[in-house]
Amino acid sequence: GYKSIHHVDLELRPINILIGSNGVGKTNFISFFRLINIIYEQRLHNYTMQNSAERLFHYGRKQTKELKGYLEFGDNAYGVTLQARDNGSLFIAEERSYYQSRPIVVSNLDESYIKGSTTFRDKWLREYLQSYKIFHFHDTSKGAPLRSSANINDNRFLKTDGSNLPAFLYMLQEKHPKTLKRIELTIRSVMPYFGNFSLAPSLLDESQINLQWSDMENNEKYFDANDLSDGSIRFIALATL
């Protein structure tokens, strides 16, 4: 069991909506995928210094002796079993990679072996495990990362807080313009007043870029991220994601 979740077996689709009252485990379910990414990135030891087994195990160590996770995608799967040391930190009792239900098992690890493995099976798994990120666009206050300028070269992927949104969109504009046009079309379906992005390096500092955009009826007036409502800028980030 993990936190408030004793056991769950759930088939996930490309888009999934979790509905439930407060405290039923929606946030904990999502945070499990962050834990999987932490394990893959070999940061389990540091993570459990702040998050001991007593906090992560369902009703603590007295009730739960180990935490198990199993993720299946097509012919491949990944499994991990975590157990607690006497000091409350966690170690990997078993880590398993599967192909067509046939596992390779490695036991008693401080950190995951998958990231450094050279086998073809584990290389394929890495593409999944390293992609497990939790994107959180809740902070839309003035001066929030989502509304701030970004380093124009910080564009390899969209960050989990959206802090490099203008740089990532600019990269799409320059390298994948059709993708950017689809994003703009999606935004207009929810925000009819939205015209287009006006993305370019700052004339005063070419290493920086702001989220500039034009209005459908007046493309000469200056608008940036601070002119968007909280819901609008969150939707732009989600459409980009």
Model-derived features: positions:
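Conserved RecA-like P-loop NTPase ATPase core
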Residues: 1, 36, 80, 228, ...
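Conserved functional loop/turn residues at catalytic and ligand-binding sites
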Residues: 1, 14, 22, 227, ...
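Pre-Walker A adenine-sensing motif
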Residues: 2-9
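Short, mixed charged/polar active-site loops
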Residues: 7, 75-79, 220-222
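Phosphate-binding glycine-rich loops of NTP-binding sites
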Residues: 14-51, 95-97, 161, 235-241
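Conserved P-loop NTP-binding catalytic core
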Residues: 30-90
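Electropositive, glycine-dotted interaction segments
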Residues: 68, 72-199
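Conserved ABC ATPase signature
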Residues: 185-241
